[in-house]
Amino acid sequence: MSALNTYIVTFNCAREKVDPKVFACHLLDALPKPQAPDVLILSLQEVAPIAYAFLGGSYLTPYFDRFRHAVEVAATAIPNGSQYTNIITRNVGMTAIMAFIPNDQANRIKWLETGGVGVGVQQMGNKGAVGLRMGYSYEDEVIELAAVAAHLAPMENGLERRNEDWKNIVRGLVFTPVNENAVRTATKLRASHRNTGEDEPLLPGSPDNFTIPTSGLYTPTSHLILAGDLNYRTSRSKPSPVDYRLYPQPTKDVTDPRHYSNLLKEDQLSSELRAGRTCHGLREASIRFAPTYKYSDKQQAVAETNDGSTWDWAKHRFPSWCDRILYLDLPLWMKTEDPPASIRVNNYTSLPLMSTSDHRPVALSLSLPTTAIPTPTEAAADSDVRINPPFTINPQWRQRRATARRKEIVVGLLAFLVLTWEGRTLILAMIVGASGGWFIMMSILAT
């Protein structure tokens, strides 16, 4: 094992159940060669209707099971590939993350942490982020890897709101251990990797940090991958009635005004990254694929049979690269100590459109070093975003998430009663029961 091969897919599910067989056919298309990845991460947005997503639990099981089945089917197509274990699945509202490890490598996961934050209405999870951090052992090293699934504010004119959402994610997404019984062991394992004294809290104001260690998005010894529908567009305003005539079409001629590279110049995320206003410290591989959003209903209807000779876009939205995957490069102190170490991008591309969504999935294949990121030197204190993050952790992060979760349950119950067939059936049964009881009571009184 010369590298930790990591494969990430982000997909906006449009609140529909994915077709496992179709998803499986293309899930691993971005692998540079038919070799099973060591870590497989799925970042899912709008994973289910709001009622099921906010209530969570068993209501989401049918949606997650389809992705588990898709991974199982896709893995069988890899020569000498093993089956995968879903080591963790978490959601915050409508945004979810799933992590898979080959069965024969599952014992390499030494600890797991998860965290999440809502950035939607009243900090609820109609928009937000959910993440995991794992300790992956290789020989005598423990490699820390964090992956975050995110869904930011929509619309062409929502640029500032998207940047604000990112700020709130950095301030509010805090990782805590999954298994409380393993907390003490995990804390000891990580102590040698963290630039923190035994008595110094990892976060200000957190309770007994030896038994409940916590960490923010940026951590000195951890890799970080961000994947999701970040919703950055190619215009600040909606298109005019004639703009669609120059929407991208399949062509290799870069001088053609309809070649996607011309629209890519207007990409908001690229300009905001350069200006240092969002996704601080993260980088992205070169984009060599068409916009991933928004495809028309007509294009979706023929998604599984289309020959790709044309792209049919929704005319009321500028085609945009909403779905993105970014990563944090190795810190300078690691490059200095271990010059050959590097993060290698094997492939970054979009996957075929599917009939259940107006977004195309996006996949990234990365090879990470099998040596852990060392504890930074004192001289590196301000040289990396891992040590000097753009925003501080909100000391009220736990209370805010708990309050938002209570609101999600209320909204989920109301949506369940009004928007789902189960809820409407329940209301009808209650009405029929109440009416029947009223008539029985009136009959008794009449006699």
Regions found by a protein language model. Give the residues of each.
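Conserved beta strand-loop-helix elements of the APE1-like EEP
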Residues: 92-112, 132-137, 152, 317-335, ...
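Core residues of folded domains in eukaryotic genome-function proteins
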Residues: 4-9, 36-40, 94-96, 126-132, ...
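Catalytic metal-binding/acid-base residues of hydrolase active sites
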Residues: 14, 47-48, 151-153, 230-233
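PP2C/PPM-type serine/threonine phosphatase catalytic core
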Residues: 99-101, 107-174, 226
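N-terminal, active-site-proximal structural segment of metallo-dependent hydrolase catalytic domains
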Residues: 1-87, 94-98, 158-161, 166, ...
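Eukaryotic intrinsically disordered and solvent-exposed regulatory patches
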Residues: 26-29, 82-87, 116-120, 128-132, ...
